Amino acid sequence: MQDKYSPSDVEQQAQQHWQALDAYRVTEHARAADGSDKPKFYACSMLPYPSGKLHMGHVRNYTINDVMTRQLRMKGYNVLMPMGWDAFGMPAENAALNNGVAPAAWTYDNIAYMKKQMQSMGLAIDWSREVATCSPDYYRWNQWLFLKMLEKGIAYRKTGTVNWDPVDQTVLANEQVIDGRGWRSGAVVEKREIPMYYLGITKYAQELLSDLDPLGWPERVKLMQQNWIGKSEGVRFAFPHNISGDDGKLINDGKLYVFTTRADTIMGVTFCAVAAEHPIATHAAQSNPALAAFIEECKHGSVMEADMATMEKKGMPTGLTVTHPLTGESVPVWVGNYVLMTYGDGAVMGVPAHDERDFAFANKYHLPIKQVIDVKGQSYDTTTWADWYGDKEHGVLFHSGKYDGLNYQQAVDAVAADLAAQGLGEKKTTWRLRDWGISRQRYWGTPIPLIHCESCGVVPVPEQDLPVRLPEDLVPDGTGNPLAKDPRFLNCTCPSCGKPARRETDTMDTFIDSCWYYMRYTCPDGETMVDARNDYWMPMDQYIGGIEHAILHLLYARFWTKVMRDLGLVKFDEPFTNLLTQGMVLNETYYREDASGKKQWINPADVDVQTDERGRPVGATLKADGQPVVIGGVEKMSKSKNNGIDPQALIDQYGADTARLFTMFAAPPEQQLEWNDAGVEGASRFLRRLWNFGVVHGDAIRGGHGNGVVAGATDADRALRRELYTVLKQANYDYERLQYNTVVSATMKMLNALEGAKDAGADARREGLGLLLRVLYPVVPHITHVLWTELGYAGAYGDLLDAPWPQVDEGALVQSEIELVLQVNGKVRGSIVVPADADRAAIEAIAAKDEAVQKFAEGKPPKKIIVVPGRLVNVVA
């Protein structure tokens, strides 16, 4: 055993040992020593995109997963921790465009490098289950399930208004539009009509909502999904009209349908607004150039609800009217830029008096405002909005004819009944959730397995011809989808008639790839999409990933699972029983502004920071020139802010165990972690102390006997054991709660206790260090493995990989003596030591004889002695 701790040597030794054992290869139905089946535990981190290098967020995520699975393995579980690559996507195309290489080559090179980085971290990954979503063996099942969904009517083709990213030249799902911009390119998103393929996720809306309740997920994530699914109870009804199209037929059969959750305000309708793409708007624009220009302007606006809420509300009258279904009055129809054709029927009723958006719109365009809800003691002002105008809890109807005096629910019921009696409306549940448009006009993705034939139309690729393989040697040139220009891919034969045909050149949204990869881990070599091994491992026991995936990935994966269930492929309803959303890794930011005012971000490693006496930063200078830089504050590590820490550089300098220890100790897993160089050095120092303790006491520990101290223990031995097992009890509790930061804190207390127990014997130290190594092993497996092996523990307990998890010796916690605070007349004057089983009389006698009592009571006999068991004695003199 080396005298000096060398992380590189220690980690190489441990990793070679695990590799020789093939230590992390997992099989189904593993058996315990007694022949019983081990309970399974499947813990998985969200698979990474192979961008080229790991970042500290990856390190934290995978270390959390690793700590969890290593500890559970020691507790007797059959644990699975797999890894794969979310390998399709636009970044590979962009990199290929910039570097003149095929996306496939770029992707596979990155995978190789990142896999090597993960292996250097000592992660307990079963690499025999590795999956790359760009592999034909994987994406063939994307294609296969798509065709099954097509058969069932879940997948379908239609032309609709979509989010179009003009830079990436592709369609985006609503979730991929952030603040009106493309989530990858940052370009302002436009509306566009385009034929594409959809998956009917709305068919599962109620189930997706209801099944959230029992999941062990953060409430924040559940709420985000609930809001996105967006269940609304209301009334759908029609405004009759006699507007005819060019064919002489009434548009939409003479009915303009709207949906509202406020049917109680129907008597306050003073206008209707339709989307720019609505047939009535299109018809009106034919004879109105100004309206046609306005409609074109609307089509270039955002299609996101969040943007609709904040953007300026614009409108233009069509000159057409519809009829109020209950009063018979004419209601003018406007085109509004805030109305989406993709939501509901593409039209809304306007009730300015009781809807804040309509109120602003009506005041802007001088439309009538008719109050029909009254709240006692309030006065209505048509020029200034007040919150009570939209109150449905306290108001009653007035100026509403037969409905006057009704409250919200009474009015909704009455209005719905009257509309139904006329055949013009009914109560209805609507959803914010929209079907998932999966067509992408990109190359590097799963080809949609369809063929276009002039004679037969759209024809599915026969199952025996799957996968439709993506050519991996294409290099994008920035002028559209390379697949559309590659005759090898494009030209084919129609499977129905045998005539020349062409393949579909759209590829699938890459979120398809991440919908089910975690199931493929269970049976990566399977000849079917999933098999019986998936039944063993799924549903997953613990999923780990960032909060940013709360809607996008997690909702789609849940939907995909339910489709697979309905097709008889799986037997469960939900894929992820528990979810941990780890906090982001933060770091300081620094910058200078160039002549144009643009910020040039500087990496923290290139900056010297000046601090005050309390350690707070007060200034910073660039190391290269000694000139000041601006301190930008603490933000998420990112390339854009140039404040990332290279994990490989950290591992090269300090070792993987130090990186793991710091990321676990610095913050609870679900909270943000703020980078701290001093904290990294502290983690390294702790590991050196641990190693040094093993070196100093190595001979005595190797010569110790047994697995614990039972007979012949000294007071020092008992004190050490009591302290260690007290800490172990808390550490076990913290492991159950996934509070790994306090687990690390517990191991530091254990090492402090061992170092401080100068009078403890070798057996007590041997037992104590054995406890410490096992508790610490999941966090820092390399150093603990080597110490465990070198100091002889493997002979007693076996390999640390599967050593039994330490149980608390309750007998060690029992104290023969306890210390009580001693008070005289309510003031603390010292303490007394009494037998742990001493009764009240014995405690009173000991207290009365104490020197402090004699001194402060001035020799007088006590008037009264108050004993608070286990805590204190108060002598009243």
Curated annotation (Swiss-Prot):
**Entry annotated with the keyword Nucleotide-binding:** yes
User: Can you tell me which residues bind ATP?
Assistant: 639
User: The motif 'HIGH' region: which residues?
Assistant: 48-58
GO BP annotations, alphabetical order: leucyl-tRNA aminoacylation
Residues folding into a coiled coil are none
What's one GO-annotated cellular component?
A: cytosol
Kind of enzyme, top EC level? Answer: ligase
Major location, coarse class?
A: cytoplasm
Give a yes or no for keyword Nucleotide-binding in this entry. yes
Q: Which Gene3D superfamilies match?
A: 2.20.28.290, 3.10.20.590, HUPs, Isoleucyl-tRNA Synthetase, Domain 1, Valyl/Leucyl/Isoleucyl-tRNA synthetase, editing domain
Which SUPFAM superfamilies does the annotation name?
Anticodon-binding domain of a subclass of class I aminoacyl-tRNA synthetases, Nucleotidylyl transferase, ValRS/IleRS/LeuRS editing domain
Record's family? Answer: Belongs to the class-I aminoacyl-tRNA synthetase family.
Task: Report the protein name in the record.
Answer: Leucine--tRNA ligase
Its gene name is leuS
